[in-house]
Amino acid sequence: MNEKQKRFADEYIMNGCNGKKAAISAGYSKKTAESLASRLLRNVNVSEYIKERLEQIQEERLMSITEALALSASIARGEPQEAYSKKYDHLNDEVEKEVTYTITPTFEERQRSIDHILKVHGAYIDKKEITQKNIEINIGEYDDES
């Protein structure tokens, strides 16, 4: 795969999988962009590269199990957590206010984190076992004539 094809593949991902826009952004002719994009997407090397990059991007965006457990452990210990808030004015296309603040987990949040960690490690059984017992009742002698 050459550099221009790689640029096309990267642009294809950034343009939301729009082949024509990606081809033009990668430097291909506007006249042939659509047909060229179709041909490039059928190219095994280009399609494999796109698939690998999408998987890599997916992995980078997702929180790993280790990261999730580390965050749960931090909350369970009651360590202060950094939070970020941004107020955006869409009409004027500008940020009105940005605030970074610290939150200390409440007792309930800490307990939920501990429960979560114990469940993940199998040390906490969330199920209740129901056992069945048969009870035998003797009423005495039964008489039809009474």
UniProtKB/Swiss-Prot annotation:
GO MF annotation list: DNA binding
GO biological process, one term: chromosome organization
Keywords tagged on the record: DNA-binding, Host-virus interaction, Inhibition of host innate immune response by virus, Viral genome packaging, Viral immunoevasion, Viral release from host cell
Phenotype when the gene is knocked out: Virus assembly is blocked at the procapsid stage; DNA is not packaged and tails are only rarely assembled on the propcapsid.
Effect of S74F: Virus escapes the CBASS system in host bacteria, allowing virus propagation. Virus makes a much longer cabRNA that has altered secondary structure
UniProt keyword annotation of Transit peptide present: no
Biological role: The terminase small subunit specifically recognizes the non-adjacent pacL and pacR packaging subsites and regulates the ATPase activity of the terminase large subunit. The terminase lies at a unique vertex of the procapsid and is composed of two subunits, a small terminase subunit involved in viral DNA recognition (packaging sequence), and a large terminase subunit possessing endonucleolytic and ATPase activities. Both terminase subunits heterooligomerize and are docked on the portal protein to form the packaging machine.
Protein family according to the UniProt entry: Belongs to the SPP1-like small terminase family.
Subunit structure: Homodecamer. Interacts with the terminase large subunit; the active complex is probably composed of a one monomer of the large subunit and two or more decamers of the small subunit.
Note: Implicated in the production of cabRNA, an RNA that activates the host CBASS antivirus system. When the gene is mutated the virus becomes resistant to the host CBASS CdnE-Cap15 system.
Protein name, as recorded: Terminase small subunit
Organism: Staphylococcus phage 80alpha
